[in-house]
Amino acid sequence: MAMATRVLAQSTPPSLACYQRNVPSRGSGRSRRSVKMMCSQLQVSGLRMQGFMGLRGNNALDTLGKSRQDFHSKVRQAMNVPKGKASRFTVKAMFERFTEKAIKVIMLAQEEARRLGHNFVGTEQILLGLIGEGTGIAAKVLKSMGINLKDARVEVEKIIGRGSGFVAVEIPFTPRAKRVLELSLEEARQLGHNYIGSEHLLLGLLREGEGVAARVLENLGADPSNIRTQVIRMVGENNEVTANVGGGSSSNKMPTLEEYGTNLTKLAEEGKLDPVVGRQPQIERVVQILGRRTKNNPCLIGEPGVGKTAIAEGLAQRIASGDVPETIEGKKVITLDMGLLVAGTKYRGEFEERLKKLMEEIRQSDEIILFIDEVHTLIGAGAAEGAIDAANILKPALARGELQCIGATTLDEYRKHIEKDPALERRFQPVKVPEPTVDETIQILKGLRERYEIHHKLRYTDESLVAAAQLSYQYISDRFLPDKAIDLIDEAGSRVRLRHAQVPEEARELEKELRQITKEKNEAVRGQDFEKAGTLRDREIELRAEVSAIQAKGKEMSKAESETGEEGPMVTESDIQHIVSSWTGIPVEKVSTDESDRLLKMEETLHKRIIGQDEAVKAISRAIRRARVGLKNPNRPIASFIFSGPTGVGKSELAKALAAYYFGSEEAMIRLDMSEFMERHTVSKLIGSPPGYVGYTEGGQLTEAVRRRPYTVVLFDEIEKAHPDVFNMMLQILEDGRLTDSKGRTVDFKNTLLIMTSNVGSSVIEKGGRRIGFDLDYDEKDSSYNRIKSLVTEELKQYFRPEFLNRLDEMIVFRQLTKLEVKEIADILLKEVFERLKKKEIELQVTERFKERVVDEGYNPSYGARPLRRAIMRLLEDSMAEKMLAREIKEGDSVIVDVDAEGNVTVLNGGSGTPTTSLEEQEDSLPVA
């Protein structure tokens, strides 16, 4: 591109890009004319051209490397232009006025010259460049006349032939081509344009009329006068479209406002705005403020999604229908696009000029109400070094009442930006827009129903609208009504529509076969196997007919449904529930038969993994069933328990088993080891670090986990190890199901199951709760458990505050494990070892004697099942590891583990007559500890 610029500069005619002066010739009285071309004399060290684009408002030589001086000053220095009148002459005409498309035309013309082997660029190459550019007005007009690049190239070669000489790197322009460039500038001036586009080059080419290009057009049957007419007509249409950006009228009274704004009142008259339901107090307050003499600028403040923009649209609809006071009757509500206003302002003062023009048009019109959505974007908009931003430019007009402006912004942005500038804040009158209630949201949805039914081509039931409002309020906590409810019905409509629009499975299979047949047919034709191609073509025709018949049948069925009164697909309550579930992961759909069976058999399933502890398993199962059928308190967590008891009896394991069974996997559980929160300063890790501290941007371990997965089990393991401040923070979680994190966001805990484990009271349980005297309770086991429970509860009251314990749903005391229960757990743990060895293709069997030995060594009522795991590790896993390393046991072996008469563990490779306990005889269950 650098080379193209240099050639263009050298070839530019004198009237365009050079300075001429008469210099007296030595030895004579006559003067001779000296012509200094722009780039031929421009040899400035350090001046390196890097780009050739963006000419409409920028220099053609986009980036001048290694030079800080202005490009035009370099040109003047190279041309030795004296000060005075001539020094004001610049070379803007060519380089600053060429559009990108015009530059592309010149570059393509040079490429065409190289292709033809010519060492010049003439009018014919410019014509080929105009056709080859493809997207400009000139290319479109020539294409509409039936002129294409291929035919034009043929005609050019016929007339001038191909060159055989050496083509220089820098290809000069012919005098006639220079004349075309000169005429294109004149054409641009006549049309009132301050740029040269491809259309002006074409007009210059036609006006020149005597070059090879004119003969080419004549040979191709094109009428120059007709081409000229078409170009001027298209230029006029483009100008009209540009003037009407933003939907304004074609009358050019307010060009700036129409370019950067959208007329909401006109859209309301055309019925293109959604109906606004309710919000009467806010609209009346806005009208009231607009009627003031000064500072008549309402600012709508509310949370995102509550309907601030809708209030401006509601005002436009009222004005369109005439239902407004005479103070604002006949006015236009125009929303300003700040992004469009700032876009393309490359030079200092350009943005301010646009804004001043805009304000002047509003001031002169006196019938404009300006609506600026996200009004906080005014602050800092357009500000550069030494410039002032949009807010400061607008301040005087806002205060004097010359400009009626409605702003809209969120509470956070209002606090961050507008409240920081008291001078701007006093010019806007705040109008609070509260979140609508569920009932108001239902009315809004009913008002919008028709628009969404037309868009999705279906119907919404009343129940679906009620469900959208209620479920979005209950389950989607981080957004606001009515926005989240509207999004629900919109996505549900899209889902139902797509489901009904699916092609039948039969038609899909036929289409797949049809594609394959077509592919094979084309390959057969390429391979000149015409007999096979003919057979495949017949099959292709048959398949097309079958597909058409299936599609026609589907259309007839839908037509018959509509005739019988069925108005297309319906969006029901279950569709809304499905969308809520897919958004949040919370199952809100109705309980299916399979799920009902799972819920009713929950205790039985959990007991496959948890041995004993009936009270805890029943309490957990009851809570899940209550939540799933929708009977739980909607403002509290699903349930909150504290599991207390000795170590190793299955407190944490029960939470893991629940997460694995009901929530899909153990990873679905949020586990917090409270031993990590023993110090006061670690409490902030739960909700996030305060501002100014490391980790503020990362969020809290608890709050972020629940925000991402709102339907889950939260396990606070070893709760008594935590600092007492943790319990204070948990009070609002247990009571109201909510917690505010360090960034001020409210996290919803209403769909979590909270489980806290504790070893408080383990010393009481170890003693067994025995007391002196007679016990009249016949069930000694239950009597002992009840005594232990009351003693543990008393000890919990000593450790935890009453307000904490009072908020828990249930305090469950785990029993000590009996020897029989430990034996069942041993079966589960041994099965784990069998499974691990099976992956290594080693079959393991243990005898009954070995199992008894493991239970004897691993049973300790005070420590639960954990000693059992250690006994298996020591007696079984260590023995197996030694034998495997000694290569006495290899893959594919069958191993029996037994205990001899002296009590030593023996590992036998191969079968023996000893009675064994095989893998198949083990219970199908999983470990407890």
Swiss-Prot record:
Q: Where is the Clp R domain?
A: 95-237
Q: What is its main location?
A: plastid
Location of the region described as Disordered in the Swiss-Prot/TrEMBL record: 552-571, 908-929
Bias-annotated ranges (Polar residues): 908-919
Kindly summarize what the UniProt induction comment says about this protein's expression.
By cold and salt stresses. Not induced by heat stress.
Region Repeat 2: start and end of each range?
A: 173-237
Which one of the record's GO molecular function terms can you name? Answer: ATP hydrolysis activity
* Renumbered residue ranges of the record's region II: 571-762
Domain (UVR) spans 511-546
Transit pept. (range): 1-38
List compositional bias (Basic and acidic residues) regions by residue number. 553-562
Any Pfam family the entry gives: Clp_N
Q: What happens when the gene is disrupted?
A: Small plants with chlorotic leaves, aberrant chloroplast biogenesis and inefficient chloroplast import of both photosynthetic and non-photosynthetic preproteins. Clpc1 and clpc2 double mutants are embryo lethal when homozygous.
Q: Which UniProt keywords apply?
A: ATP-binding, Chaperone, Chloroplast, Membrane, Nucleotide-binding, Plastid, Protein transport, Repeat, Transit peptide, Transport
Residues involved in ATP binding: 302-309, 645-652
Task: List the GO terms this entry assigns under cellular component, sorted alphabetically.
Answer: chloroplast; chloroplast envelope; chloroplast inner membrane; chloroplast stroma; chloroplast thylakoid membrane; mitochondrion; plant-type cell wall; plastid
Which tissues express it? Answer: Highly expressed in rosette leaves. Expressed in roots, stems and inflorescences. Expressed in photosynthetic green tissues with high levels in young, developing leaf tissues.
- What are the boundaries of the region Repeat 1? 98-163
Query: Any keyword Ribosomal protein?
Result: no
Q: Where is it localised?
A: Plastid, Chloroplast stroma; Plastid, Chloroplast membrane
Q: Where is the composition biased (Acidic residues)?
A: 920-929
Which InterPro entries did the record assign? AAA+_ATPase, ATPase_AAA_core, Clp_ATPase_C, Clp_N_dom_sf, Clp_R_dom, ClpA/B, ClpA/B_CS1, ClpA/B_CS2
Q: Which SUPFAM superfamilies match?
A: Double Clp-N motif (SSF81923), P-loop containing nucleoside triphosphate hydrolases (SSF52540)
Family designation:
Belongs to the ClpA/ClpB family. ClpC subfamily.
Assembly notes? Homodimer. May form hexamer and interact with Clp core. Interacts (via N-terminus) with CLPS1. Interacts with CLPF.
* Descriptive protein name: Chaperone protein ClpC1, chloroplastic
Please spell out the taxonomic lineage of the organism that makes this protein.
Answer: Eukaryota, Viridiplantae, Streptophyta, Embryophyta, Tracheophyta
Q: Which gene encodes it?
A: CLPC1
